[in-house]
A protein has these predicted regions:
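Soluble non-cytosolic domains of exported or imported proteins
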Residues: 75-82, 105, 138-141, 168, ...
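His/Asp/Glu-enriched short active-site or ligand-binding loop at hydrolase and phosphoryl-transfer sites
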Residues: 169-210, 244-252
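CE4/NodB-like, metal-dependent polysaccharide N-deacetylase domain
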Residues: 85-96, 120, 137-168, 176, ...
Length: 252
């Protein structure tokens, strides 16, 4: 997620919100031109060993220039994640869920629902510390690798395919570490601003107005009441299809 104040259950988060960290470095140029829907990419699979991926922050979609990536941060949440899953199912859309390690550990049944529905997992650290780019390498390693283990255990053995730094607080070290564990660093192009709960119409308007920034859209399924997010997704996904966009996963 982007850096935010007023985190609700984030009282245990280490570090204060200190402003949005830009993640545009390494982003591909986004083509706003619409096209046909593309077939859903293969979802997770459990592998016996880690295959290293690129440490460059991913922004583009494996669905091509006419596809968007739906990414959902900060869960899983036993109330809101199933509702997000239902909306995705109704629209035939796959998404990437960036999970907090202890939340995954606390709700393994929800993690398994995400995997069973064909969505992908993403490591969003243990404590959601948006200042972790100012912390030691050993601290960064603990945050990333402990969460990877917790998410993998909760999923029944399915590993996260991406790593999203809280608030975009990437470092060269954290990107290389995640990539060496098979997790592509994942940025975003459009922050829906749903975390502040500005109202469903405002969330929809933000995504529509900023869609030209790039294909990876950021939403949240935890950290408070996410009914506005659920409603916004219910409006946005049919609208995106009407505009000719397809849906994909972030590139690996």
């Amino acid at each position: 997620m982007a850096r935010h104040a007023g985190r609700g259950w984030y009282g245990r988060v280490i570090g204060a919100a200190i402003g949005v960290t830009a993640v545009a470095a390494g982003a591909s140029v986004w083509t706003a031109q619409a096209g046909q829907n593309t077939p859903a990419a293969p979802a997770h699979h459990t592998t016996p060993k880690t295959v290293a991926v690129s440490p460059v922050i991913a922004h583009s979609s494996d669905g091509g220039a006419h596809a968007v990536n739906i990414t959902i941060d900060d869960g899983p949440d036993p109330t809101w994640t199933p509702q997000v899953l239902q909306v995705l199912r109704e629209n035939g859309v796959k998404a990437t869920f960036c999970m907090i390690g202890p939340e995954a550990q606390a709700h393994p049944d929800v993690v398994k629902q995400v995997v069973a529905a064909g969505h992908r997992l993403c490591d969003h650290t243990v404590s959601h510390d948006t200042a972790m780019d100012h912390k030691s390498e050993s601290y960064q390693s603990q945050q990333i690798l402990d969460a990877e283990r917790q998410i993998t255990e909760a999923s029944g053995g399915v590993r996260p395919m991406y790593y999203r730094a809280p608030g975009g607080a990437f470092t060269p070290y954290s990107r290389k570490l995640a990539a060496s564990h098979g997790m592509r660093p994942l940025g975003w192009n459009v922050d829906s601003k749903d975390f502040e709960r500005p109202g469903t119409d405002a969330i929809v308007a933000t995504v529509r107005s900023e869609l030209a920034n790039g294909p990876t859209l950021l939403f949240h399924d935890a950290g408070g009441d996410r009914s506005q997010t659920v409603a916004a997704l219910r409006t946005l996904m049919p609208w995106l299809k009407q505009q000719g966009y397809g849906f994909g996963f972030p590139v690996r």
